[in-house]
Curated annotation (Swiss-Prot):
SUPFAM superfamilies: Actin-like ATPase domain (SSF53067). Fe cation binds at H117, H121, D312. Required for the formation of a threonylcarbamoyl group on adenosine at position 37 (t(6)A37) in tRNAs that read codons beginning with adenine. Is involved in the transfer of the threonylcarbamoyl moiety of threonylcarbamoyl-AMP (TC-AMP) to the N6 group of A37, together with TsaE and TsaB. TsaD likely plays a direct catalytic role in this reaction. It comes from Psychrobacter arcticus (strain DSM 17307 / VKM B-2377 / 273-4). This is tRNA N6-adenosine threonylcarbamoyltransferase. It catalyses: L-threonylcarbamoyladenylate + adenosine(37) in tRNA = N(6)-L-threonylcarbamoyladenosine(37) in tRNA + AMP + H(+). It is found in: Cytoplasm. The gene is tsaD. Binds 1 Fe(2+) ion per subunit. Belongs to the KAE1 / TsaD family.
């Protein structure tokens, strides 16, 4: 089964084709993928502008689709099914992918299915060289979500903890903006932190010892106050370069410390030994190194998506779609998107 995956939930236009007949090959069934990022467009505004995101998806979907077909050396008539991101995300952005996918499926007379964006991230590590077996605990950490989930199977998800305010990735973006760094914040803070001392400043770890939920808004406020205290203006771009690097390193260390300790606590609470980490923030090298070190102490293993599948992409949607389509699930012709969609509402496979 060749499944076309479409991802348009935010500011990346991602398309990919997954072929189940090649799942045991080196590429794990991924025939090809194309990705267009709107980072440069939104960097001018310091964050994603929903209307601009939607327009850019519309502009890029058809050219990217044609590029993907050429890359995979197939025709559109060889596609057996289509999976598109149904939610959560920006409603306008979601609608562009959903309408393109549903219309193409109708024209080709093939099934289509809407996929939960975060389920795509959760299942992406299954396309890696060392795929985890169920059950496992998953940390889904991105610009819009921070979730700890006990995954007992596809569609069998138990929410263990989540952010009660800002997501970790969102906190990275806002801290970066305060430090005068461009969007997206995560990679730029990580780069600046390489030259900083992670122990230079003590930042709070909100809710660290209160269950498995997260809170990052207090950490964001602490960074703002720290910048104001160190340079007097509150404008991080005017700070001494070493001070900025130390603040970035201390902030990153505080976020990572919080995430790692919650993961360890979650594994112990549900008596599991496998952790899957996915989402854009999962690419952070300091987070990966700290997780591997701390999980080794409790004889637990950590699994990641392949590097190209950490951020938003069409491959994870194609694979999640394949798993659900082969179980007999599909959607009717009505196009509907869900900007807010709890993972616990998903049907089991």
């Amino acid at each position: 089964m060749k499944v076309l995956g479409l991802e348009t939930s935010c500011d990346e236009t991602g398309l990919a084709i997954f072929d189940s007949e090649q799942i045991n090959s080196e590429n794990k069934g991924l025939l090809g993928q194309v990705l267009y990022s709107q980072i440069e467009l939104h960097a001018l505004y310091g964050g994603v502008v929903p209307e601009l995101a939607s327009r850019d998806h519309i502009r890029k979907l058809v050219p990217l689709f044609n590029e993907l077909l050429a890359q995979c050396n197939i025709s559109k008539d060889e596609i057996d099914a289509i999976a598109y991101t149904k939610g959560p995300g920006l409603i306008g952005a979601l609608m562009t992918g959903a309408l393109f996918g549903r219309s193409l499926a109708y024209g080709l007379d093939i099934p289509a299915i809407g996929i939960h964006h975060m389920e795509g991230h959760l299942l992406a590590p299954l396309m890696g060289l060392n795929p985890p077996a169920f059950p496992f605990v998953s940390l889904l950490v991105s610009g819009g979500h921070t979730l700890l989930i006990a995954a007992h199977g596809i569609g069998q998800y138990e929410i263990l903890g989540e952010s009660i305010d800002d997501a970790a990735g969102e906190c990275f973006d806002k801290a970066a903006k305060m430090l005068g760094l461009p969007y997206p914040g995560g990679p730029n803070i990580a780069k600046l932190a390489e030259n900083g001392n992670p122990n230079a400043y003590s930042l709070p770890r909100p809710m660290l010892h209160r269950g498995l939920d997260f809170s990052f808004s207090g950490m964001k406020t602490a960074v703002h106050n720290l910048i104001k205290d160190t340079d007097g203006s509150g404008n991080g771009s005017d700070s001494d370069p070493q001070v900025r690097a130390d603040i970035a390193a201390s902030f990153q260390h505080a976020v990572v410390d919080t995430l790692v300790k919650k993961c360890v606590k979650a594994l112990k609470q549900v008596d599991m030994s496998r952790l899957v980490i996915a989402g854009g923030v999962s690419a952070n090298s300091h987070l990966r190194e700290t997780l591997e070190r701390e999980l080794a102490k409790i004889n637990a293993t950590v699994h990641y998506a392949p590097p190209a599948l950490c951020t938003d992409n069409g491959a994870m949607i194609a694979y999640a779609g394949y798993e659900r389509l082969q179980a007999g699930q599909s959607d009717d012709l009505a196009v509907s998107c869900v900007p807010r969609w709890p993972m616990t509402e998903l049907p089991a496979v």
